[in-house]
UniProtKB/Swiss-Prot annotation:
PANTHER family: UREASE ACCESSORY PROTEIN F (PTHR33620:SF1). Keywords: Chaperone, Nickel insertion. InterPro entries: UreF (IPR002639), UreF_sf (IPR038277). It comes from Oryza sativa subsp. indica. Signal peptide: none annotated. URED, UREF and UREG may form a complex that acts as a GTP-hydrolysis-dependent molecular chaperone, activating the urease apoprotein. GO terms for biological process: protein maturation. The keyword Chaperone applies. Belongs to the UreF family. This is Urease accessory protein F.
Length: 261
C-alpha cells in the first residue's frame, strides 16, 4: 500500500489523503533575502561582547564612585546604572542618531568635532576616543565588504581633523551595516548598560548571576530612556548628571585602579 500522510490544513469531507510530496512547498531564497540574512549576522556580531573594542577597560565612573563611597551595594549600583543610561541618552544618543541617519564622512566629521567640544572632562573624552578608534579599526577589519569603512580609516587615521569619538562612530557603522535609527539608538544603550554592569562584576560589587538579573531588571529603565531621548538633534544634546561627570573626572587621581577610566 502506498504511504500517505495528512496535510496540516483540515481534510475535506471525504477525508482525502495525499502524498507527502503534495504537501511540500519549497521557496528558493532570493538574493535580497540572502543579503538581509547576512546583514542580520553582521548586526549581531557588532553587539557581541567578544568584539575587541576595548569597552571592558572602562567603568564609566563606577570605580571612582566605589572609592568615593557613593556606590556600596546592589541598590546603589542600580541607581548608578540608571543615571549612566540617562546621561548617555541625553548627551550621546543625539550623536548616534544623526550619524546613523547620515552615514557619510562629512556628517561624521562635523559630529565628531562637536562632541569633542562638548565633553567636559578629560577622562571621559579619552575613553570615548579610545573606544571609537578601536571600534572603527575592528569594523574596517571585520566588515571588509563595506569599503567606506576602510576608506574612512585610511583617510583620517593620524590626522588631527577628527578625534574618533565613540558615539558618532557607533552610529555611522550601524548605519552602514544596516541598522535602522531606533535599533541603533537602542543598541547603543544596551552596549552602555552591558559594559557598566560587567565592570561591576569585576569590581566585586555583584556576582555574575546577580549581574544578569540586574541587567534584566534595568532593561525597562533603558527602554524608557530610549523612548525619552531618541531621535533628537545634536542641538538638544545635554548633560543631565553633573555629579557623574565629576566622578568620571576623578578617576585619573585615584592611587590604585583596575580600569582605564
Amino acid at each position: 500500500m502506498e504511504r500517505v500522510m495528512e496535510c496540516d490544513y483540515p481534510a475535506s469531507k471525504k477525508n482525502k489523503v495525499v502524498h507527502p510530496m503534495d504537501c511540500e512547498m519549497k521557496e528558493e531564497p532570493t538574493n535580497a533575502a540572502s543579503m538581509n540574512q547576512h546583514s542580520l549576522w553582521s548586526q549581531w556580531q557588532l553587539l557581541d561582547s567578544i568584539l575587541p573594542t576595548g569597552g571592558f577597560a572602562h567603568s564609566y565612573g563606577l570605580e571612582a564612585a566605589m572609592q568615593s563611597r557613593m556606590v556600596n551595594n546592589p541598590e546603589e549600583l542600580r541607581s548608578f546604572v540608571v543615571q549612566v543610561l540617562e546621561n548617555t541618552g541625553s548627551l550621546l544618543l543625539p550623536f548616534v542618531c544623526c550619524a546613523n541617519k547620515s552615514p557619510d564622512a562629512a556628517t561624521w566629521v562635523k559630529l565628531d568635532q562637536l562632541l569633542e567640544a562638548m565633553l567636559t572632562n578629560e577622562v571621559s573624552r579619552k575613553a570615548s576616543m579610545s573606544q571609537g578608534s578601536a571600534l572603527l579599526r575592528v569594523a574596517a577589519s571585520v566588515f571588509t565588504e563595506i569599503q567606506s569603512l576602510q576608506d574612512l580609516r585610511q583617510t583620517f587615521l593620524g590626522s588631527k581633523i577628527v578625534s574618533f569619538h565613540h558615539a558618532p562612530i557607533f552610529g555611522l557603522i550601524c548605519g552602514l551595516v544596516g541598522f535602522d535609527s531606533e535599533t541603533t539608538q537602542r543598541a547603543y544603550m544596551f552596549v552602555t548598560m552591558r559594559d557598566v554592569i560587567s565592570a561591576a562584576t569585576r569590581l566585586n560589587l555583584i556576582g555574575p548571576l546577580a549581574a544578569s538579573v540586574l541587567q534584566h531588571q534595568v532593561a525597562e529603565d533603558a527602554e524608557r530612556m530610549v523612548q525619552k531621548w531618541k531621535d533628537r538633534g545634536v542641538e538638544e544634546a545635554t548633560q543631565t548628571s553633573p555629579l557623574l561627570d565629576a566622578l568620571q573626572g576623578c578617576h585619573a587621581y585615584m592611587f590604585s585602579r583596575l580600569f582605564c577610566t
